Amino acid sequence: MAHAVRSKSNWCWQTYLLERINQVFSISLPPRAQPIGPVLAGAAFQTHSQQNNSGHQFGDRFHSKGHQDTEGRILWKEASTRTTDSTETADTQLVQRQGNGGICLS
């Protein structure tokens, strides 16, 4: 019986979190559009996780030998720069679009 209560409690907690995420990321979209609050929250969590990873864990994806050009040069710097730039751009756009308790995509 305790397991059933725990499962219901966990389900309620997940439902509450999803509703809260949708409230925090209230976005003006056409009625047929899908809610993107969970997607934004996932992106925010992923960005935060990447910042907290140690350098070698995050960098291994770009520093591996599989990311070389035809002359054998490692392309990690270019890939790393692109990742940082796109993250900064996304964060900047997110801050610029926030207003009136939500985000307005125009």
Swiss-Prot record:
Compositionally biased region (Low complexity): 81-92
Q: Where is this region: Disordered?
A: 48-106
Identify the tissues in which this protein is expressed.
Heart.
In terms of superkingdom, the source organism counts as Eukaryota
- Positions with biased composition (Basic and acidic residues): 58-80
Q: State what this protein does.
A: May be involved with the regulation of GNRH gene expression. It is not known if this protein is transcribed.
Descriptive protein name: Putative protein SH
Report the source organism.
Answer: Rattus norvegicus (Rat)
